[in-house]
Amino acid sequence: MDGVGIVTTRFYEWSQCLHLESGAQLGSLTIAYETYGELNAAGNNAILVLHALTGNAHIAGRNFPDERYPGWWDPLVGPGRALDTRRYFIVCANVLGSCYGTTGPASINPATGKPYGMDFPAITIRDMVRAQKILLDYLGVKRLVAAIGGSMGGMQVLEWGFLYPQMLDAIIPIATCGRTTPMQIAFHHVQREAIYADPDWQGGNYYGTAGPRRGLALARQIGIITYKSDPSWNMKFGRNLVDPRKYFQLEGQFEVESYLAYQGRKLVDRFDANSYLYLTKAVDLHDVSQGRGSYNEVWRDFPCPCLGIGISSDFLFPPYQVQEIVRMINDGGGHARYAEIDSPYGHDAFLIEFNQLAAIIQPFLKELRPDLAA
């Protein structure tokens, strides 16, 4: 089956104030997004895909003919695929606070004519979702077949269920949690500390210079460790050395060390350090019960059917966290089911195990809206 071909990233300019959960506001907002398929006349065949921490709106196809890689969920999007563009209108927006076209710390502050830097206000997962709702209203989407996403994207999915349940047929959170744990917060803390410790961070006012490349690269390396599993490290690298002749030298590298350094360099070339700070903090602040009562009670009468998907080897978001969401929805009188990706690839499996994901998601979507699956 062919994919979606060449796609264009578009930009929506919202000229009104966006009021944030912190009480701060943004005077205007730009949202970068991509769409696939066609919105039907009723405006009710849309699926919203939410991306993870350093992701973007480019989930499928290529932005130009010789682009090296297609979008990050390309095998799932297109005619006849799990997110079937013959039936569904697929939308993905770059999140608020990121650096792929949506307003974030690297954007120009209209009050100063300079990048926001650390003057950018604190943002939360709920703020991201409210920005996405603005975009969907602009696009004419009246109802979503589903909101779906993994990791930080799964957090957005859950908040969609709390903020706009009347607009959803169902939610599909993947490899995520209802509130971040101390371990998850701890890993983000040391990643942010790596950026702060780089003198080139300059208090966040590094635009126009090289910026904190070493700090961001180290932060990424720490993050990469949490995205894998012990079996996946063993399968990929074992104890192999880059150069066995340097076995007893401090600068000698195991292949796993070389890989981490490479991943750090890759991110530095495509991501903004301040966005990394703001987005990891938004993840740390994630708690669906914040301002809504107790965590145990907030799931009572949850209005959206839920398909929660865990990953068997996930170290960062262990499957019990998705299982807990499903259990609490069901115990509260709602309707939820659980499925699991059986994979050695750890948290990254939702970006790798496309066949398993398709086998889980596709029948669920057809069951939700048989009128669209005919």
Swiss-Prot record:
Keywords: Acyltransferase, Amino-acid biosynthesis, Cytoplasm, Methionine biosynthesis, Transferase
Function: Transfers an acetyl group from acetyl-CoA to L-homoserine, forming acetyl-L-homoserine.
Lineage: Bacteria, Bacillati, Bacillota, Clostridia, Moorellales
Binding annotation for substrate: R220, D348
Family in the record: Belongs to the AB hydrolase superfamily. MetX family.
Protein name listed in UniProt: Homoserine O-acetyltransferase
GO cellular-component term (any): cytoplasm
EC annotation from Swiss-Prot or TrEMBL: 2.3.1.31
GO MF annotation, one: homoserine O-acetyltransferase activity
Subcellular location: Cytoplasm
